[in-house]
Amino acid sequence: MKTDIHPKYAPVVFRDLASGATFLTRSTVSSSKTIEWEDGNTYAVIDVEISSESHPFYTGKQRIMDSAGRVEKFNSRYAGFGTKK
């Protein structure tokens, strides 16, 4: 097995910009920005725009779209498609 070919795998803090939530995990990404974590250690921080803390699917605040109008519009538009004239 080759040595020194894999990226550095280290603890990283991800910060959700939408909700302000932060969580510590391990990743190969790196950042020049750092943050002091609850355990007193300093870790690289990666800002993400959306995570499971703020995504509508995971928070239960999703909107259910009424697709009936879209289906009817599609059917009316392509009602005669494929028929010989």
Curated annotation (Swiss-Prot):
Gene3D superfamilies: Ribosomal protein L31. One of its GO terms (cellular component) is ribosome. NCBIfam families: L31, PRK01678.1. This is Large ribosomal subunit protein bL31B. PROSITE patterns: RIBOSOMAL_L31 (PS01143). The lineage of its organism: Bacteria, Bacillati, Actinomycetota, Actinomycetes, Micrococcales. Disulfide bonds: none annotated. GO terms for molecular function: structural constituent of ribosome. HAMAP family: Ribosomal_bL31_2. Belongs to the bacterial ribosomal protein bL31 family. Type B subfamily. It comes from Clavibacter michiganensis subsp. michiganensis (strain NCPPB 382).
